[in-house]
Amino acid sequence: IISKKDKYAVVSAGETVTLPGYSFETTGDDEPEVEWLIDDNSIAALTTSKVDGKLTGEVKTLAAGVAVLTLQVKDTPADKDNYYIVIKPKNAPSSCTADTTYNTVSLGWSKTADADGYTITRKVEGSDTEQTIAHVDGTDTVSYKDTAAQTGISYIYHVYAYTKYTNNGQTDYANTDTYASVKATPQLGKAAMTSVTAEGYSSLTLKWEKVDGATGYIVYRSTDKSKVDTQIMDITNGAVSYVDTALTAGNTYYYKVQPYCVVNGKKVYGDASGILSGKPLP
């Protein structure tokens, strides 16, 4: 019945939609009398009138949701056709936060009361290519963990609110025009030294905890606690201990360890550990 091929209109709340025209295959001179019906007056208001014998109508959208408009032949409900008006949420989330670990960004955002859920997009900083990475169903579901991010790469995340609907048998999402945004760079965890012990003559043994994703560790040493910045070893074999030799007995040595991984041929560093000290045996 409805002449328009695309029977979905996606709009923002407050917009007015003009209903499409219609036609019938009839053998007589007169077309049957028809009427427009709406399924939910709380999200949209329907007004109709006749112009040159044709029924026309407008729909004033009020709130987020999917309004189903039915054009049917009066007294013959089987002769009908539907037109769908998808109304986006009024507002996007107002804020978004991000926590990072190795190859992971954990997002959180403020709730949007009239949303069916949220669309998450991501792009590399400096790029114009925005990629949809998730649709999160549920008004109250306000977090998402991106485990496909890469350590050392800066990303821009956008969070949209959406109205969910079915379009020709396929699930689709009507996103808000605005969004909450946050920048995040996944990074290695902080190193943690566990001990510096004198186990041999003029030497100290350093131990630390394994950092997830680290491919190596830089060991720093100094005799000045306020300036532990001299690199003495680059551990590349995944070891989490190191024996520092040829030290002077009786002196106090200060150490810290910094993890790193290699991304696109470059070292990306995590935070260095706290400082521990030790004295070699005489």
Per-region residue spans from a language model:
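Recognizes extended acidic, P/S/T-rich segments that occur
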Residues: 119-151, 218-248, 264, 271
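Pro/Thr/Ser/Gly-rich low-complexity, intrinsically disordered linker/stalk tracts
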Residues: 89-113, 151, 168-213, 249, ...
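Beta-strand signatures of extracellular beta-sandwich domains
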Residues: 35-37, 117-121, 160, 216-220
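Extracytoplasmic soluble-region selector
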Residues: 1-89
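Extracellular Ig-like/FN3 beta-sandwich strand-entry sites
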Residues: 16, 64-68, 115, 152-154, ...
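An aromatic-rich alpha-helical recognition segment common to small helix-rich domains
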Residues: 93, 109, 120, 146, ...
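Beta-strand-rich modules
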Residues: 146-167, 244-265
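Extracellular acidic loop/turn motifs
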Residues: 24-33, 114-117, 127-128, 213-215, ...
